[in-house]
Amino acid sequence: MSKSYTVAVAGATGAVGIEMIKTLEQRNFPVGNLKLLASARSAGKTLKFKGEDIVIEEMTSNSFKGVDIALFSAGGDISKQFRADVVKSGAVMIDNSSAFRMEDDVPLVIPEVNPEDIKKHNGVIANPNCSTIIMLVAVAPLHRAKKLRRLVAATYQATSGAGAKGMEELQIQTRQLLNGEPIEPKAFAHRIGFNLIPHIDSFLDNGYTKEELKMLNETRKMLHDDSIQISCTCVRVPVLRAHSESLNLEFAEEITPEEARAILAAAPGVTVVDDPANKVYPMPVDATEQYNILAGRIRQDISRNDRRGLDIFVSGDQVLKGAALNAVQIAELL
């Protein structure tokens, strides 16, 4: 990229927005002019970019004039409110919310998985759900090699998935519980300190949550294959940052753990961390602030009578690859 771009970050003061700004700087994205947009209560404050203080502006319908790329992480309602303004201005909206992901004319993109879909955009490109990204960066290369037929996932999702307020609640409740103080859950349905909550997003009539069906529907859309059977259970865990997932995979063809390790070692965006004998395996503490997804505990599924099944454990930074980094990578491909 030789030219420079005017980039807007909408939702600049949120956890993902702040990470977007840092990622633009770390990856030397050719930003000629950076506009930081947020609500009226944040207007006038400043955030640093490349050593300079950038004043945050209130987001209005006129904020996108002259903008080339608008990175949105301000919630689905805000994305819907400003979509027409962004597209009319000639900018490309890269949206981190779930507002447009399943629309037929909106590409849903992970650059390591389906970069070719970017070309189909009509002004809006959707960032997938964080758990879907972390899963598919590891699963897609295996699917390309051996064709995935069935996937069962259990997630261990950090409090960062609920934003800064989620992480703060974990820290506060941990202190309160250690001191024997009463707690009052606010960011989550139940206490998150020293607890697990098998409830992310709202429940549907079939007993699944919206989060679980996002992983199903988004996977099928990005792999362009509605025949893949998928079931997920999403669980919030008392971890500050970085999600983990236990994946049981069934393929059309036989695959060994050795083959899987070789495929993943050669795949972009994946680091194989798989030496259990020496206590080496993916953990959220090691995935935090890392660009790559960590993949390990790769083993044959012994519940099967053939070699078409694998079990894999992955960890990835939800705020980075699960959100901000993926959005910036999409911008790099435009």
Where are the language model's segments positioned?
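Active-site-proximal catalytic alpha-helix in oxidoreductases
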Residues: E169, H190-P198, V239-S244, L249
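N-terminal Rossmann-like NAD(P) cofactor-binding subdomain of oxidoreductases
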Residues: M1-I192, S227-Q229, A262, K279, ...
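C-terminal active-site/capping subdomain that shapes the small-molecule cofactor and substrate pocket
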Residues: I228-L334
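Generic solvent-exposed, charged/amphipathic alpha-helical segments
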Residues: I21, L216-R220, R261, A265
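A glycine-rich, Thr/Ser-enriched phosphate-binding loop motif common to dinucleotide/cofactor-binding enzymes
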Residues: G123-I134, G207-L216, G322-N326
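Glycine-rich beta-alpha junction loops
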Residues: A40-S42, C130-S131, T155-A162, L196-L204, ...
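Oxyanion-binding "anion nests"
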Residues: G193-L240
